[in-house]
Amino acid sequence: QLSSLQGAENYLLVFWSTGCSHCLREIPELYKFLKDTQKIKVIAFSMEENAVRWEQMKKDFPHWHHALGLGKWENKTAKTYSIYSTPSYFVLDKNKKIIEKPALFEDLKIILEQL
């Protein structure tokens, strides 16, 4: 799915979960922060045990591309990216190569402002 996205200067891959209190605070703030930019496309990969809460919550972020990873921590994609905590952020260039992996939300905002 990531390979099919086109047309952005940068991409932001966000691993999150509807059961994560940090995610529930940061993800809406991130959405507001990026709302008016066209140069960054967001891929929100939600790691869940089931799709019920995710189906409802993804509607709050209509401009993002959404993907569901059932199995939460055991999900193949989460394991591929070595996700051990949520939220986890990966900033990608236009060729979808990882250029930054900030640990803190404040660091992410600084990186995104500089793109």
Where are these regions (language model features)?
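Short active-site neighborhood of thiol/selenol oxidoreductases, capturing the structured segment around
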Residues: L2-L24, L30
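A cross-kingdom marker for long, charged
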Residues: G7-N10, H63, K76
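Active-site lining segments that contact anionic ligands and/or coordinate catalytic metals
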Residues: G7-N10, I40-V42, T86-P87, F105
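Short hydrophobic segments within beta-strands
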Residues: F15-W16, F45, L92
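Structural microenvironment flanking redox-active thiols in thiol-disulfide oxidoreductases
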Residues: L24-D60, W73-A78
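Short, hinge-like loop/turn segments at secondary-structure boundaries
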Residues: D60-P62, S85
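Short hydrophobic/aromatic-enriched beta-strand-loop microsegments
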Residues: W64-G69
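Thiol/disulfide oxidoreductase modules built on the thioredoxin-like
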Residues: K72-E113
